Amino acid sequence: MPLPDFHVSEPFTLGIELEMQVVNPPGYDLSQDSSMLIDAVKNKITAGEVKHDITESMLELATDVCRDINQAAGQFSAMQKVVLQAAADHHLEICGGGTHPFQKWQRQEVCDNERYQRTLENFGYLIQQATVFGQHVHVGCASGDDAIYLLHGLSRFVPHFIALSAASPYMQGTDTRFASSRPNIFSAFPDNGPMPWVSNWQQFEALFRCLSYTTMIDSIKDLHWDIRPSPHFGTVEVRVMDTPLTLSHAVNMAGLIQATAHWLLTERPFKHKEKDYLLYKFNRFQACRYGLEGVITDPYTGDRRPLTEDTLRLLEKIAPSAHKIGASSAIEALHRQVVSGLNEAQLMRDFVADGGSLIGLVKKHCEIWAGD
């Protein structure tokens, strides 16, 4: 399928996707019932969409195009109520978190969807292993060239986005010692990590043509980069965050990305170069492994900075943009999170350290999601 022309969007409009866990009490393992839930709610959703993701234990909640985080929060809140009621009617529960702490990938059923079945044929067991749960945020752009500039600008802050959303310390019944283990699942995919370097939309079109020669890439949706342009929506999509445990934190993360995008495209503070990515994977790893306690390294100077310090600096820089787009509440909440040192990955570990089981942890996550 050829790459579509870049659809012009209103700059800084917002779309958010949350991949949720469908679990089966009292054992709280992943259920294989997302299709049943989707059928139950499809005529009750008035804004946004509830749909499949890769496997039957995943349920995606997606907003419509929103002007700001308040509109997005309203849509999510309405969807949440409908989904929670449908889940209760079918003796299921819903929760966030980037990974389920003890599910076995071998049990996961790939959705009966042509695209997902084709992906299963291409990637085999890797697709079942990709039963992990992330938050994706789309930001509208006026042109393809703006999208490429924004993509490179946001890529500088991938460690910050990962660290602030880290919520996947447990996997396959084990403490991984990572704050966010979810991104590691995609390391075997040939398109893992950052998009190959291009400097404008014309070069991106050439890149996509080259990738399509592999026969594994039929559309932009087949590319799993950390951040990717979405020409059919006219957006840049940030894909590195774990699904948070609460709806409010998910909205705050979206506000952070929207405000950062506004700052980048209005101030144009960087002249992007290919060398910007020289230490990208090392800095990304620091965020995944240590969260906000990680350290990032400047590829030009070699200076090393604590992620906590650099995140506070970012929040300060984008505060005026956040005010202009109605996202100040998100930036203030994230600032409090960084200063307090609290994060969802550590809260999970604290629960287990206090004697809680992994089954009890999932139950707690369901209570948190339903109570937010």
Swiss-Prot record:
Q: Which GO terms describe its biological process?
A: modified amino acid biosynthetic process
Which InterPro entries is this protein grouped with? GCL_type2/YbdK_subfam, GCS2, Gln_synth/guanido_kin_cat_dom, YbdK
Keyword Aminoacyl-tRNA synthetase present in the record's keywords: the answer is no
NCBIfam families recorded for this chain? Answer: gshA_cyan_rel (TIGR02050), PRK13516.1 (NF010040)
Role description: ATP-dependent carboxylate-amine ligase which exhibits weak glutamate--cysteine ligase activity.
Family in the record: Belongs to the glutamate--cysteine ligase type 2 family. YbdK subfamily.
Description of how the protein assembles with itself and partners: Homodimer.
Q: List the protein's name.
A: Putative glutamate--cysteine ligase 2
